[in-house]
Amino acid sequence: MTDISPKSGDELLIVDNADPEWKTLAYLHEWADIARALDVATGYFEIGSLLALDGQWQKLEKIRILMGDEVTPRTRRALLESLTERAKAKLDVSIESEKEKNDFLTGVPAIVEAIQSGKIECRVYAKQKFHAKAYITHARSRVVGSAALVGSANFTLPGLTNNIELNVQLRREVDQLQAWYERHWEEAEDVSEDVLKIMQRHVAEYTPFEVYA
C-alpha cells in the first residue's frame, strides 16, 4: 500500500498510471477509506469511473463532480447540441458501454440512489471550456487533513487506469484550490437531475427477469 499520509519535507507524490499497482484509481480507492468527501473537477465524466470505485465511493459522505463539456470521437454528434447537452450525451454513451459489463446492474442502482439522496451532485461548467482535472479529498481526521491530486487525468475509467497521466498531490495549497473549486462550482449548472434521468432510463431497460436471473 502506498502511503498517502502527510509527507515530510518536500517529498512529491506523483501518480501517472505507469505503475500497475499504483494508478489514479488506487489513489482514490485508498483515500475513500479515510475521507469524508471528494470534490472532482474533470473535463468530462464517464460512469465507468464510479463503477470502478464501487464499494469505496459509498464510504464517502459527499461526492461533487464538476465537469466540462468535452467529448470523445464517439460522441461527436453532441457538438450539434447545447453545451450541457454535450455532457449528458457523453454520459449516455458511457452508460451504453458499461452495460456490456457484469458490474452494471449492481453498480448503477447504487449511484442512482446516491444522486437521488443528494450524496452525489453533478454540475456542468459552461461559461468557458472547462479543462481542469483535480481530485480534492477531505479526510475524516483533522490530523490527516485535506489533499488534492491535480494533473491531467479525467474522471473516466481510462483516465484513472490506462492512460499515462501526470498527477501531483498537493497539501499546502489545498485551501486555495478549494476556493477555486467553490467559485467554479457556484458558476456551474446543476445537472444532477438530468444525469439521474439518463441513468434511470438505462436501468429501466432491463426486465425483472434480466435483473434477477
Task: Enumerate the language-model features and the residues they cover.
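PLD/PLD-like phosphodiesterase catalytic module centered on the HKD motif
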Residues: M1-A213
